[in-house]
């Protein structure tokens, strides 16, 4: 990693990336976050919670006990801390502080990757979706969903680039409100941005407003939608596109005042998909590709739930839960920075696993192992062309070139 002190331990380097001392001190000073805190300052809290998420700790006592590890204690300059102190601190840090830190870190990732140069033909894609996380209603009364069930919704916008995705914005709500209630908070209004979301955000009045304000979107239409076809556009019969048309949606008072573009295609299993958009400068095939990228936000939710432990929370208040979610996004951005700055081309999961295995070693050793090329290369399992082998053997026999039959080293697979 260029410009980094590789003599430090991987643990030290990770904590420094997480806390970004200059930026964090500036924000803490502006918001007065650490003003009366003596022991567990924000940079240490960030490091502890991030480590707990990466290592899949189950509770506050396990976080507190990890300081018995001399390497962790030394890296944090913290001998011990009580579990209740971690709980109070996590619940008291202003969420605005962590949100601001996340947004600045996200912008740094975007600058490092150079998204404007990697977005390619389809343009600047922003994927929008939500994921519900179940909670125990007796412990999280503020997140009551049903009488016997609690939960929250994590509404998220992520930005697509060639190598993957970067989280862009998050809104946390109780699980009850519909997805479309958070559309205005997540939709990007810049003219070069395309917002991609699923059928849960279908709202004709909202779509008319987006058309008025030249906000671009691509979504999926529900099966029971009322459609009035105005113009049928030409479709390449050799493509996967079945229909491309200009339509009006709804009827009577619910009829949209702006026409939209309707594209019909199929998924990999042959099921019909109807895509709705106000984008006019991309082909139907390109717009189908745009909507296929929406799956990446599902994979992102799965990744952070499995590998950053956002299904289990260390605090019970809404502020503690939201703070932990922001720390998970901050941790993800730090992993993206490590991947980009090190030049590693493998998956983020492989990088994370090696990072955890090398925490107590030097950062230079971690980089060496991360970028090490395999000593042996395998051709894998080969699919044999039995017809070709038979034809070749038959030809040799017919021309009486049969000496090979007495050769114990002969291999008919090597032609």
Where are the regions a protein language model picked out?
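Extended, structured, electrostatic nucleic-acid-contact surfaces
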Residues: 67-76
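Single, function-defining residue in the core of a domain
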Residues: 1-62, 66, 79, 90-93, ...
